[in-house]
From Swiss-Prot:
It catalyses: (2R,3S)-3-isopropylmalate = (2S)-2-isopropylmalate. It is an enzyme of class 4 (lyase). Pathway: Amino-acid biosynthesis; L-leucine biosynthesis; L-leucine from 3-methyl-2-oxobutanoate: step 2/4. It comes from Neisseria gonorrhoeae (strain ATCC 700825 / FA 1090). This is 3-isopropylmalate dehydratase small subunit. One of its GO terms (biological process) is L-leucine biosynthetic process.
Amino acid sequence: MKAFTKITAIVAPLDRSNVDTDAIIPKQFLKSIKRSGFGPNAFDEWRYLDHGEPGMDNGKRPLNPDFSLNQPRYQGAQILLTRKNFGCGSSREHAPWALDDYGFRAIIAPSFADIFFNNCYKNGLLPIVLTEEQVDRLFKEVEANEGYRLSIDLAEQTLTTPGGETFTFDITEHRKHCLLNGLDEIGLTLQHADKIKAFEEKRRQSQPWLFNG
């Protein structure tokens, strides 16, 4: 998993509430269990003018010019700004996979669906909860300023605007540690590999019958 420390990046606005996981990555693309390759189909039904299916050449598909993420000013964005209850609907880890593969490192919203929120942390995405008033202000600034960038410092738990205004956000110490060090659940377990090995060796000596056959 990629570590997250600090970024300064373009912000892309998605001015919609209750964006569900089927909108983030439609169900027909869920057959693969690889974590990569979902980016071109993120927001597929809004992003393209035709219906997408696995195996299609996305480079030849007609883009929807009215979809915000297709606008030239938001290309290369690594921060997604959106509205309340983002990631609702069915539980699918493919949703954060698709957003990560698109290039997003952080998502800002007033609220997130619980399962999606947890899945973001497991896949190196930083979900940031701000108040609706703060999110409204950011939407206005993004709209008014082309190339608008925010700076996020995870260690300090701060988000800073180009004008120098700083917002703070909450995150548990455990999740912060994992993101700062790029640790998923496997990586976190491997940090204790020596202790696990020592425990198993001690148990092998004290309870050898468990290891016979």
